């Protein structure tokens, strides 16, 4: 099994193969990807769709001297396997294992780290220009999907690249007609307009009826139809940017890919190759439902993904999705916005029930935020559902277009904190710090499912921009209450009171997901725990009361310490005059790698044991560690 694949330790081995061996190699590589992902979990559909393209690129180009930049990067498993990491696939996305995305520190073949969308053309152009300035004769290649091409950054790069006539730059559009959510907007409609016109559809149907008795001729007509799709675009779009457009060609046909790429190597100036692929190619279940198989956990390939036998705890994403539908039912002004993450953000049901109030703006976070601001000026109640890591891409719009004008936009910030297998590129480590410094913002962090629901309701009532952050995955198991209750603005709550005497009284001020482990630590130490709820406005009154009645304060957040929620507590304490020693716990000042979320939190000292250990070492000097009975306040 994998007889050919076992002989490939790097692309030089690949280039020694006879062309006739490449398709059998592709079959083995596709089977290996499927087997590997089924055992570790990871991105599947996209990787099954890039097998032949990956082989062709490494076969034709002299990698790593020629540079390949993979946009988004979750489709790089075939690339990793062919570049010396075949045996490492068993550790994919696991702690101390190989990343699910390209990483420069992992391999010289990973020429540029990616994970966020639409960055590849800019990076590849920089490499092409840099190589020219250094006197190096090499190609720089950007592989970008049709979903990523909807983002403004991709067109900014193309606009810049088009005037670089001597750059050895190749942009490959991997057109699979499906990003995570279906591509949207004028560009994708433009690509499809010729093929969906009434006259064209009627003519095609008539021709197919006539040619149905001649299958070879019908197949020729279908191929001509595919090429007609490409005829519309170059003259009006890609070539207007200064690129030489080639395609579309079948991205699964090595006999088409390899000669085309070999010809492109002889050309100068920016080249644009349009390849058509299919997500899930070669695995019928993934072909039929590429969204389901976009990022599965472990599964049996023979049976496919099966629903969980026992109902799991409700995820925070589900809590958000249910709240949004309930809020929209009560208020016709509520609208939902997602930057191409309908499934991931829990908006599938909302789209079905309220299609006229659902806006998928594509991979366009900047536009999403300013679009929401515009809606707010007309009296609507926009809710932007966005991952913490992707909100970073729209920071200027958040400040300039929303906060500066004090517009009532709700930001439902998913994937806050560590995200596990996706690693540092997708972690929501910075939102508390970069949000709390913005005037007019209200910022909340949910500690359980019901609190998340009620915070979202509270956010919708505010006259200013408001953010609610919540983590990836399942909640604590707390039931959500259907009835809405507005949480008092800027008010936390004490969840546990210490019974320790003066000199040993510790108060833990916990935010969001850190409330549960802080309570566990407090049980071991007999400490007070406050669920702070609000990062901005911080509950200054509660902070000062705890400072006055305790000897030590500890702040705990699942975010960066510098400028974060703990800093807000320290500022409030200092202003109150009752200064106490403070220990600020949070994510370390480094990028936290991929792995099991619970293990990562423990590694960062943010589980119950880690929090207790840090407090003992800092304040209690290893003495009096026996806890008295817990005293929690409802």
Curated annotation (Swiss-Prot):
Keywords: Isoprene biosynthesis, Magnesium, Metal-binding, Thiamine biosynthesis, Thiamine pyrophosphate, Transferase. Thiamine diphosphate binds at residues 74, 115-117, 147-148, 176, 283, 365. The keyword Magnesium applies. GO terms for molecular function: 1-deoxy-D-xylulose-5-phosphate synthase activity; magnesium ion binding; thiamine pyrophosphate binding. It catalyses: D-glyceraldehyde 3-phosphate + pyruvate + H(+) = 1-deoxy-D-xylulose 5-phosphate + CO2. It comes from the Bacteria. Binds 1 Mg(2+) ion per subunit. Binds 1 thiamine pyrophosphate per subunit. GO terms for cellular component: cytosol. Pathway: Metabolic intermediate biosynthesis; 1-deoxy-D-xylulose 5-phosphate biosynthesis; 1-deoxy-D-xylulose 5-phosphate from D-glyceraldehyde 3-phosphate and pyruvate: step 1/1. Mg(2+) binds at residues 146, 176. Its EC number is 2.2.1.7. It holds the Pfam family Transketolase_C. One of its GO terms (biological process) is terpenoid biosynthetic process. Its cofactor is Mg(2+); thiamine diphosphate. Catalyzes the acyloin condensation reaction between C atoms 2 and 3 of pyruvate and glyceraldehyde 3-phosphate to yield 1-deoxy-D-xylulose-5-phosphate (DXP). Belongs to the transketolase family. DXPS subfamily. Homodimer. This is 1-deoxy-D-xylulose-5-phosphate synthase.
